C-alpha cells in the first residue's frame, strides 16, 4: 500500500474546514431554527420556542404569540418530561418566504414512562428577517394534513 502524500492530505483537510465554515443556505438555516425550537421544548426553555415567533404570529383557532406561550407553559407544568420527535421536514424556500411541513410526535408525562402522546401534521410559514427566519403562521392537526 502506497502512503498518501502529505500535501494531498492537508489539501483535503483544508477543504473540509472551509466547507464547515461556509455560510449556511436559507434552507439549512430554516431547518436549524425548527430544530432549535424542538430542543427548546425538550429542554424546557420556552424562550427558545417563543423567540422565533413573529409579532403577528397566528396559529390554530386564531392563537397568537402569547396564546402559544401560555399553551407551552401549561404543557411544561403538566409534563415533567417531554419528548418531541420530528418526522422529515419538507421545506420550500421562495425568496424571503418559506413553508415547512412535517409530522411531529409529542409525548409527555411525569414518571418513567410517557403518559400522553399525540401525532400532529404541522404546516408552518416563515419569513426571513435579517439572518433568521420568523414563524408567522402555523397550523396543526391530528394525523391529517392541515
For the regions a language model picked out, list residue spans one by one.
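Sec-dependent bacterial lipoprotein signal peptides
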Residues: 1-19
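Short, low-complexity N-terminal intrinsically disordered segments enriched in polar/charged residues
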Residues: 20-52
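Solvent-exposed, acidic/flexible segments
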Residues: 23-30, 42, 61-65, 115-119
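Hydrophobic pocket/interface hotspot
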Residues: 37, 45, 49-50, 57, ...
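Short solvent-exposed beta->alpha transition segments
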Residues: 50-87, 93
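Solvent-exposed loop/turn segments at secondary-structure junctions
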Residues: 56-58, 106-107, 142-143
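Surface-exposed, charged secondary-structure patches
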Residues: 74-116
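Short beta-strand edge/turn micro-motifs at domain boundaries
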Residues: 99, 116-146
Amino acid at each position: 500500500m502506497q502512503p498518501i502524500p502529505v500535501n494531498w492530505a492537508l489539501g483535503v483537510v483544508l477543504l473540509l474546514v472551509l466547507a464547515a465554515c461556509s455560510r449556511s443556505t436559507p434552507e439549512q438555516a430554516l431547518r436549524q431554527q425548527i430544530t432549535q425550537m424542538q430542543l427548546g421544548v425538550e429542554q424546557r426553555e420556552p424562550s427558545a420556542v417563543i423567540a422565533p415567533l413573529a409579532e403577528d404570529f397566528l396559529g390554530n383557532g386564531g392563537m397568537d404569540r402569547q396564546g402559544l406561550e401560555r399553551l407551552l407553559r401549561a404543557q411544561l407544568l403538566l409534563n415533567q418530561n417531554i419528548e418531541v420527535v420530528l418526522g422529515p421536514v419538507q421545506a420550500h424556500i421562495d425568496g424571503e418566504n418559506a413553508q415547512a411541513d412535517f409530522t411531529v410526535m409529542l409525548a409527555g408525562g411525569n414518571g418513567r414512562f410517557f403518559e400522553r402522546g399525540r401525532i400532529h401534521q404541522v404546516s408552518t410559514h416563515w419569513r426571513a428577517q435579517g439572518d433568521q427566519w420568523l414563524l408567522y403562521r402555523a397550523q396543526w392537526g391530528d394525523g391529517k394534513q392541515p
